[in-house]
Amino acid sequence: MSEITYPSQSRELVCFSTIQVQTVQDGIVNLFFAYDVFSKFIMSTPGCINLTPANIMKQVDFLMHHKDFTIKDIPFTLVMDIGQDLEEELNLIVEPFKGKVIFDTDFIEKEMMPDIAVMMKLVGKGS
């Protein structure tokens, strides 16, 4: 795990990852979630069927323009566990928004995925 400094306010440290879900209409779909480590606020971007480099970059770009993400204009770190081979391109997307991308699968699993699992369980129950 890389050295990650825990945030002192929201939007300083955001995890961004995907989970796969089975749908009736489209089969397996990749759902993308952003997770603010400080506030534990979860945002989603549109899903996609194929997890291609173009789709990963499109999802990050969508996040940069998401109304809930653009509330604060502060430097941030986007922690990802997909798209490692796209690091340069992803940083080009986030740099205009004062961001930088790092990759840390262990951090995503520890910080983000437990809350995503709870959310998906609640959604599955219709709560």
Give short role names for the model-derived ranges.
Residues 4-15, 19-28, 37, 41-127:
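RNase H-like DDE/DDD metal-dependent nuclease/strand-transfer catalytic core used by mobile genetic elements
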